Amino acid sequence: MTGNDTVGKLVDLGSGNFAYLQEGGSWGWSNAGLVTSEGVSLLVDTLFDLDLTRQMLGAFGAATPAAARIETLINTHNDGDHTHGNQLVPGARIIASSAAAEAMAAGVQPGTFTQLLDNAAELGDLGTFLHRNFGAFTFDDIDLVLPTETFVDKLTVTVGTKSVELIQVGPAHTPGDVIAYVPEDNTVFAGDILFNGSHPVIWAGPPSRWVDACDLILGWDAETIVPGHGPMATNDDVRRLKEYFLTLIELGGELRQKGLTPWEAAEHVTSRGMWPTWGESERLIVNFASVYQQLGDEPTFPDPMDGLTAMAQFSVAHEPKETIS
């Protein structure tokens, strides 16, 4: 049972489509979607732990009988907050890009989160950060179920009489990011290509690929956009995110030329009050590191855990002190 009382909010998108939004949209608090037609459904992503996924499936089930017949599950990428509940959708086709499936198999497993949290008191700033951001989740009993089908570039699947277009736009946030687009309803499930109201995090990059992904979404002029984190979005939100990356690329080039490290570049941005309402400013460190890599530097954080540790140190340095009991 999750230790956090946050309950997601069901949003009826019309035309038989639904979103499930988790309040805040911070680390681990992701969104999901449901597309229905002719009494069957397609689920876009599961959540970070089993209890949260059960709550989400229950909300969809209360909203539409079609939720009882989930024929297809799309994992938009490999992160656990979009895949850890896969086991609760038995019998469904599970589809992801080939790159996402490979990253799921090779990446951080649910048990690793448990081990890190159990030892948080001994991990310094990293432990404080993990306790603060992931302590509300329970990773026990998760059996990570991998995709049963994969694709490269594009794939069209059907749910009832509707077509759902899956477009691989990664590597960007992660190696194999996928956007799900429902042309009939002009609805986009953007996965973590869209963080609404917080800094995104570039685990893979390059950031220029993320700009291209924003352009793809804007080209649809979608009526409905479900982000991977945060509240329902508009095309203006997508434009803001595109401008964010364009600014990071330009500013990162200037700061790199001046010899600033990614940490110092992040300090430069936060000290000037850029994007003051966006949460998770610690992500600027890995984002600038990705910009520097795109400009020719060797990877600053070849191991993702190194990047997470740097973000933890930055976050703890800029937040009130916390004691882990």
Model regions: which residues?
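Divalent-metal (often Zn2+) His-rich catalytic cores of metallo-beta-lactamase-fold enzymes
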Residues: 187, 209-271
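C-terminal regulatory/interaction regions
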Residues: 258-325
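Active-site metal-binding motif and surrounding structural segment of the metallo-beta-lactamase
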Residues: 39-41, 51-96, 221
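Conserved beta-strand hairpin/beta-sheet module of binuclear metal-dependent hydrolase folds
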Residues: 10-59, 178-191
